[in-house]
C-alpha cells in the first residue's frame, strides 16, 4: 500500500483491478486525474482507468519508481454518470489515507504495520474523545 501521507501523482499511470459484474478479475489502465475531490463530505480521487459496477472494493495500483514495486493507491468505489449514462473512464476511488484511518479505527492497524494491542489494552473511541 502507498505509504501514509503520500498521494499518487497527477498523470501517473494507474491500474484498476476488480471483478466487475461478477466476471473474473480484470485489469484496466489509466491515469490519475484528480488527487482529491470531496463528494457528499467524503474524500475521493479520480482516475481514468475504466471501472464498472462490481469493481468497487477492488484496488487501484501504481508503480513506485522509488520503492520498485506496485502499490495500492486507492479503493475503487464509484463510477461517474452523466445524463443517466455511466462514464466508466471516470472512476472515483477512496484514497489510501482513508484506508489507514479505517483500519486503525476498527482495531486493525496491525495490517499496516502498527503494533498489535490485545483488546484489554486498547482505548475505545469514546476514551479518545475524552482526552
Question: Could you say what each language-model-derived stretch is?
Answer:
Residues 10-13, 28, 43-45, 56, ...:
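Envelope-exposed proteins and targeting segments
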Residues 32, 50-76:
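Catalytic nucleophile loop of clan PA
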Residues 1-23, 61:
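Active-site substrate-binding loop(s) of clan PA
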Residues 22-30:
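Short, Lys/Arg- and Gly-enriched loop/turn segments at beta-strand edges
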Residues 23, 34-46, 85:
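Gly/Ser-enriched beta-turn/beta-hairpin loop segments
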Residues 72-131:
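C-terminal cap/linker of serine protease catalytic domains
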Residues 17-20, 49-50, 75-79:
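Active-site-proximal beta-strand/loop segments in catalytic clefts of secreted hydrolases
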Amino acid at each position: 500500500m502507498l505509504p501514509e501521507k503520500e498521494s499518487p501523482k497527477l498523470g501517473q499511470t494507474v491500474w484498476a483491478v476488480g471483478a466487475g459484474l461478477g466476471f473474473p478479475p480484470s485489469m484496466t489502465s489509466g491515469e490519475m486525474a484528480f488527487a482529491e475531490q470531496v463528494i457528499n463530505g467524503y474524500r475521493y480521487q479520480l482516475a481514468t482507468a475504466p471501472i464498472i459496477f462490481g469493481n468497487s472494493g477492488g484496488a487501484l495500483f501504481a508503480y513506485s519508481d522509488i520503492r520498485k514495486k506496485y502499490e495500492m493507491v486507492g479503493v475503487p468505489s464509484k463510477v461517474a454518470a452523466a445524463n443517466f449514462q455511466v462514464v466508466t473512464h471516470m472512476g472515483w476511488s477512496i484514497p489510501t489515507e482513508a484506508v489507514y484511518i479505517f483500519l486503525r479505527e476498527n482495531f486493525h492497524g496491525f495490517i499496516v504495520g502498527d503494533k498489535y494491542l490485545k483488546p484489554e489494552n486498547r482505548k475505545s473511541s469514546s476514551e479518545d474523545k475524552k482526552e
